[in-house]
UniProtKB/Swiss-Prot annotation:
This is Porphobilinogen deaminase. GO terms for biological process: protoporphyrinogen IX biosynthetic process. Binds 1 dipyrromethane group covalently. InterPro entries: HemC (IPR000860), Porphobilin_deaminase_cofac_BS (IPR022419), Porphobilin_deaminase_N (IPR022417), Porphobilinogen_deaminase_C (IPR022418), Porphobilinogen_deaminase_C_sf (IPR036803). Its EC number is 2.5.1.61. The keyword Transferase applies.
């Protein structure tokens, strides 16, 4: 077994926090392995003044890290699974995930506790077309503006009254110890299905790296790995990008089956389709493909 691992990650506070969670898992199983964090600046980090869908999508948060992986400058990469496209380079694999955190979104507002309570024509900041479509469904009167940046910068924009509210993932807020119940309010899945893979930390490796495969076997949280299959199958089948309003959430039923709620909107946001599938873990991927076909038909 190797004695050191180079781990590629973005430089953000959240990315480094998540990388350290992965290192904790590695150390539990392989206490003698030295883990070196390799911080990589991605295109998505550099370009902050444009919506992701105008500059290449969430893959911009992975491109340089995946290139470092392919060039053997790092041994494994840590990502937020919600940033990972449905189709990744053929020589790479999402080989492990950590246990999923609560996947709900959070309404962040200094003056009101829910989207419904906002005054008429209030301004919400988000760069997510999924969140935008869900908000418009609830409150078509609200103004929605493009809003990017890390957690601290977004909250500062709230304080400076640039917007009335924003929406963030609970998982990121919790990992940064930034969830404050005074102005952070959970949004239920019935109102806003999460991004595919939201709340999951993913480990990506080269398919031919047998040492990393063995390490991933030990740290992989299998129940979460099975849950994300139908969600990721939808994403892969549609080859969806940041212009596509898409969401999904999987959970286990008492009998061990997986229930997945899916959402898909058309590109201009004028229509939205929902679909639910119940599947056996062995066939859960097929349920994502079926959901894609059903929702595409309803939107046509």
């Amino acid at each position: 077994m190797i004695n050191s691992i180079r781990i590629g990650t973005r430089k953000s506070k959240l990315a480094l926090t998540q990388t350290n969670l992965v290192i904790e898992q590695i150390k539990q199983h392989f206490p003698n392995i030295n883990c070196e964090i390799v911080e990589i600046t991605t295109s998505g980090d550099l370009i902050q003044n444009k919506p992701l869908y105008d500059i290449g999508g969430k893959a911009l948060f992975l491109k340089e890290i995946e290139q470092a992986l392919l060039n053997k400058k790092v041994d494994l990469a840590v990502h937020s699974l919600k940033d990972v496209p449905g189709i990744i380079p053929k020589d790479l694999s999402i080989e492990a995930v950590l246990e999923r955190e609560d996947s709900r979104d959070v309404f962040v507002c200094l003056t009101h506790k829910s989207i419904e309570e906002l005054p008429k024509n209030a301004v919400i900041g988000t760069s997510s077309v999924r969140r935008k479509l869900c908000v418009q469904r609830m409150r078509p009167d609200l103004e929605i503006i493009v809003f990017r940046g890390n957690v601290d910068s977004r909250i500062n924009k709230l304080i400076n009254k640039e917007v009335d509210a924003t929406i963030l993932a609970y998982a990121g807020l919790k990992r940064l110890n930034a969830f404050n119940p005074e102005y952070c309010h959970l949004i239920e899945h019935s109102q806003m299905l999460p991004c595919i893979g939201q709340g999951v930390i993913a480990i990506e490796i080269r398919k031919d790296d047998h040492d990393m495969i063995e390490i991933c076997k030990q740290i992989n949280h299998l129940p979460t790995f099975e849950l994300i299959k139908p969600e990721r199958a939808l994403l892969e089948y549609l080859d969806a990008n940041c212009r596509t309003p898409i969401g999904a959430y999987s959970k286990y039923l008492d009998n061990g089956d997986i229930q997945t709620d899916f959402m898909l909107g058309n590109l201009d946001g004028s229509k939205i389709a929902f679909h639910t599938e119940i599947s056996n873990p062995k066939t859960s991927k097929e349920s994502g493909i079926k959901a894609a076909k059903v929702m595409l038909l309803s939107l046509s």
